[in-house]
Amino acid sequence: MDEFHRCGKEDSFWQQCFLYPLFFQEDLYAISHDHYLDVSSSSRPMEHLSSNDQLSFLTVKRLIGQIRQQNHSIVLFVNCDPNPLADRKKSFYSESVLEALTLVLEVPFSIWSKSSVEGMNECKSFRSIHSIFPFLEDKFPHSNSILDARIPYSIHPEILVRTFRRWIRDAPSLHPLRSVLYDYRNSPENLQRSIIVVPRVNTRFFLFLLNYYVCECESILFSRLKRSSHSRSLSHGSFPQRTHFHRKIKHIIIFSRRNSLKSIWSLKDPKIHYVRYGERPIIAIKGDDLLVKKCRYYLLIFRQFYFHLWSEPYRVCSHQLSKNCSSSPGYFLRVRMNPLLVPTKTLDDFFIPILITNEMDPIVPIVPIIGLLATEKFCDISGRPISKLSWTSLTDDDILDRFDQIWRNLFHYYSGSFDRDGLYRIKYILLLSCAKTLACKHKSTIRVVRKELGPELFKKSFSKEREFDSLPFSSKAASQRERIWHSDIPQINPLANSWQKIQDLKIENLFDQ
């Protein structure tokens, strides 16, 4: 891939305008041929690979000629030949061409990524960001409705090709893409459908199309909202890979596509929050039922006019949020945003553009957590550990398990924080509170309890940190550079009840005033 755009910025215009000659580069098919053999070698006997799967560049050229001359009524990329040898041979060359097509389509996106990061001095390593829970807990309490808007995974081949025309100016280079999409559409399993369904074959090619399609949907949607907002503030951030991104939209006025002079609806001061995990976007809205209906209607109209896709109404469904739905975990979080370059890649390491985004650096809110611990009688208001008298009637194992559960949940949630000093202070408070509780139960001192129970006392409890550090992806060197988040919190935080009481008390005080 680096060889194709080795000339850099000077040849970017030429490469965008003339991608079709790349299809006749012999090196390109050597790369795709090697990749195809690597993928298929695990599922096919080795003797088949040595004698029959020898790449002939002349055969590849003939296949490209057939692609250009076909009328979309024949199927080149589907195994229809009853002869297994001919069937496998056809599949071998068609898959090689498909791999080459994927490499060619990645070229303009790689050029775009180089221009987008121009002027940036450094590229920091990617950190796995645990942003979904903080986002939900911070934003959703201020919302009363959510829209579950599934991104359509089916689209007509011609619409998908037209979206590529926004990036690729060389029309002949899109002919193979159009032919491949129509061939899959005309396959026996998709023959009765008017739209193409992304299959699970040739993951590299179709995963590239799926990622491109999702990015195109969201880029058009939010650019449209930004233009319609009359240059008002539109803050947004992105979180790729697992958490992808969330966007916050304020002060938006949306106009009809049919008549740009006539406003469909106007939002004076709305609060709309957008978060996506995979293909499931969730939009949280603060407003009345009319506002929710307008947002739902706009999403349906947007898909219909920009992608000529009739989206069934049930794919954008609305739900009412409970007032207490997002406060049950009972965690606090403070964040700071830093600019970050995120190079992303997916299966088979094929190209995905580098994202210029904001890095979320969570910070452990030590003061609120100590306040909660003081409310639950684990420490005093200054953070000095005290015994948990209400637990002295329990067995030693139950006491250790309860303290261990609290620490495990807190560590899993805050282990990706920028500064762990506050987290270790919480561990110190819980550790000594556990020791003082056992000492109070046995009517002795901490030293006596530790001497009687042995040095293994605290190895049973507070052990999750060592388990975390021993994970295969958590080497000592890597842990100093990266932060790995856990999200396997098995139950509600025991401190959640106290946190909920504080929130209810604040609400009651507001009404009393």
UniProtKB/Swiss-Prot annotation:
UniProt-listed GO biological process terms:
mRNA processing; RNA splicing; tRNA processing
The protein's UniProt keywords, in alphabetical order, are:
Chloroplast, mRNA processing, Plastid, RNA-binding, tRNA processing
Cysteines joined through disulfide linkages: none
Q: Where in the cell is it found?
A: Plastid, Chloroplast
Example GO molecular function: RNA binding
Q: Which GO terms describe its cellular component?
A: chloroplast
Q: Where is the major localization of this protein?
A: plastid
For whether the record's keyword set contains Membrane, the answer is no
> Do you know which InterPro entries this protein is assigned to?
Domain_X, Maturase_MatK, Maturase_MatK_N
Pfam families xrefs: Intron_maturas2 (PF01348), MatK_N (PF01824)
Regarding protein family, the annotation reads:
Belongs to the intron maturase 2 family. MatK subfamily.
Q: What function is annotated for this protein?
A: Usually encoded in the trnK tRNA gene intron. Probably assists in splicing its own and other chloroplast group II introns.
Q: PANTHER family recorded for this chain?
A: MATURASE K (PTHR34811:SF1)
HAMAP family tied to this protein: MatK
Q: What is this protein called?
A: Maturase K
